[in-house]
């Protein structure tokens, strides 16, 4: 028995792994929460060129600015990115730079009102995207169970991606939100690939073979997309590109579980039961 045949024969066991992973990710999201970036909650982001470590910069920023909720991380370019949940004047920024012996590379400020507008837009965009996908999927298949399975896989992809964001500290920003929308688009493609390839082979004795064959194509897509996303993750010169790459990688991990295990199991059981 080959590798792909073993994969199909063990779908029942793999489904347990998929569900456990989803529960862990959902729990992480609820317990830890996904941090919102300044473009969604408002505030100031300062990029400093300094040799001081992020912890030192955080403590200095809190002391000078009188704000406790300060975050500082080292970027892939070696700069320190400081996020402060309030408006900073030019004097505030210069004081911070002098305190840590650094130079100001850039400053980005988002007002609280604009941040709320962005956040409200995000909360509307995701449900609209899922509704649009549900209409398209149902129009293609005209099969409620298959359509529900695809939408279930999409929802699990988002749950898993948000959980991994919570665990790794990747914030929810406009950039990472774009990554989440990319996940929806990619997941629709992979689920339709699986569903179309398998539904066309209706006879029960061919279902496992159809799933295994479609998995070969799907896992090749995952491998090539992951390679591109990892290159962007490692070599990106922009924080936005870094966040997009991270979220896409999380989504690809989730899609392997939710398309090629969860949805494959639903399709096999649906066809086998006819």
Swiss-Prot record:
The keyword Transmembrane helix applies. It comes from the Archaea. Keywords: Cell membrane, Membrane, Protein transport, Translocation, Transmembrane, Transmembrane helix, Transport. It is a multi-pass membrane protein. It holds the Pfam family Sec_GG. The keyword Lipid metabolism does not apply. One of its GO terms (cellular component) is plasma membrane. Signal peptide: none annotated. The chain crosses the membrane at residues 14-34, 121-141, 143-163, 175-197, 217-237, 247-267. One of its GO terms (biological process) is protein targeting. It is found in: Cell membrane. InterPro entries: SecD/SecF_arch_bac (IPR022813), SecD/SecF_CS (IPR022646), SecD_SecF_C (IPR048634), SecF_arc (IPR024921). Involved in protein export. Belongs to the SecD/SecF family. SecF subfamily. Part of the protein translocation apparatus. Forms a complex with SecD. This is Protein-export membrane protein SecF. The lineage of its organism: Archaea, Methanobacteriati, Methanobacteriota, Methanomada group, Methanopyri.
